[in-house]
Amino acid sequence: MSSLPDDLLLSIFARISRLYYPTLSLVSKSFRSLLASPDLYKARSLLGHTESCLYVCFHFDSGPNTHWFTLCRKPDGTLTNDTSKKKKSNGYVLATVPIPHSPPANFSSLVAVGSDIYNIGGSIYLGPSSSSVSILDSQSHMWREAPSLRVELMSHSASVLDRKIYVAGSYKDGNGDSNSCKNLFEVFDTKTQVWHPEPIPCSKTKGIFYSKSACIDGKFHVETTHGVVYAYKEGRWDKAIPTMFGMRASYSFCEINNVLFYIHRGVFRWYDTKLRMWRILKGLLGLPSLPENMFVRLADYGGKMAVLWEEDRPSCGAGGRDEMMIWCAVIALKRHLNFSFWGKVEWFDHVLTVPKQHVFVKALTASL
């Protein structure tokens, strides 16, 4: 197959699910080059083969850089026995994405728009605050710089609405004491690659912007002491619904098709904006018991829910390393006529093993 003309190979690759690309890239350097070619993704788009690709970001104690992985099919294509769960593997794995010098990041700084993953302001935990903005091209897996924020933020969060990135954060002004914190709200247009020329006023908002936000019903919801929401069409700030933020004590939440989902103590819930209350996600037969929500991450996976969680790896003896197993499940979501949500577990698998000393930064999806 490697002796075929490049044009023919591109045509073949464009018709193959991207889940198999990490394996194909191992065949040869020419394959790796073709799989990163812009022409390949143009062909995929013309064929209507654009798909959602799951990316997962970790930080290990071995250095300041983040490490990236993407969901794919196992290279050998076989189903292996997994005795820890008394089941056979479904053939999925998180493959390493070779990205050199990947900048620090945290949950609230990472968002995806199309095939680009944006790192807004870096990580406030792994180094000094930053105003830098970096973009990871998930086609070539190369970072490039974007226009920076106006100031370095102490805490911040970013969410996407209509291909624009809404960033809310706080920064120290003046002498830098605790009473000098101010809020900042900016909007980045991903089409023009420029920030809104005049930052949107947020002086009337009460409380400092925290590091959690979500875009629901065309509005940018930001967690503060009381919670606020920005209605961009009206250009004003309003007080948020208290119950929407009351359930999100951690980062185990995501927005899927304009619905906010959350897991707390092993129970999945979704937010009903009409009733202004959290409701239980029904179904989920076959899903194993999950750990505390601080060890769980959720992501929109093409309208389905990707659930990733950590679990202690069985001891390998006195000389064994302390490691954690990363599991992944994909759940199809369906809304019934009575407005209840049901989840159907399509598969779950042990997809990665990582050092015990790590930070599970985030899982998110790019469209390719």
Curated annotation (Swiss-Prot):
Instruction: Report what the protein is called.
Output: F-box/kelch-repeat protein At5g51250
Is Repeat included in the keywords of this UniProt record?
yes
Q: Does the keyword Cell membrane apply?
A: no
Give the UniProt keywords, A-Z.
Kelch repeat, Repeat
What is the originating organism of this protein?
A: Arabidopsis thaliana (Mouse-ear cress)
Q: Where is the F-box domain?
A: 1-44
Annotated Kelch repeats reside at: 116-163, 165-218, 260-304
Q: Which Pfam families match?
A: F-box (PF00646), Kelch_FKB95 (PF25210)
